[in-house]
Amino acid sequence: MSNPELPIKFTDSAASKVLSLITEEENPALKLRVYVTGGGCSGFQYGFTFDEKVNDGDMTIEKQGVMMVIDPMSLQYLVDGEVDYLESLEGSRFVVNNPNATTTCGCGSSFSI
């Protein structure tokens, strides 16, 4: 069930993968941090890391007992987007489906607005 008040979606697939990775690490304090930095072939790029901290101003979304964290600067580029986890012949990875991106590169990790 989705919450229409949240500015970004955290899919079941992404939450399940985060739960699996956290279980492997044996550290339940870990959270998935999603961020945007300058760089990549289109101007901005997405980043994913595990973090134990939630900083002042961070937005958090909890699903399936795990938490996704986004800093306020990155959130402005991700509003109405979706963080998902895909498995395909090309490999498996976390992705951001971002309706604000006007251009994305072939790998999907770089975008422009």
Swiss-Prot record:
Its cofactor is iron-sulfur cluster. Keywords: Iron, Iron-sulfur, Metal-binding. GO terms for molecular function: 2 iron, 2 sulfur cluster binding; 4 iron, 4 sulfur cluster binding; iron ion binding. GO terms for cellular component: cytosol. This is Iron-sulfur cluster insertion protein ErpA. Homodimer. InterPro entries: FeS_biogenesis (IPR000361), FeS_cluster_insertion (IPR016092), FeS_cluster_insertion_CS (IPR017870), FeS_cluster_insertion_RrpA (IPR023063), HesB-like_dom_sf (IPR035903). Required for insertion of 4Fe-4S clusters for at least IspG. Pfam families: Fe-S_biosyn. SUPFAM superfamilies: HesB-like domain (SSF89360). One of its GO terms (biological process) is iron-sulfur cluster assembly. Binds 1 iron-sulfur cluster per subunit. PANTHER family: IRON-SULFUR CLUSTER ASSEMBLY 2 HOMOLOG, MITOCHONDRIAL. Iron-sulfur cluster binds at residues 41, 105, 107. The keyword Iron applies. The keyword Chloroplast does not apply. It comes from Colwellia psychrerythraea (strain 34H / ATCC BAA-681). The gene is erpA. Belongs to the HesB/IscA family.
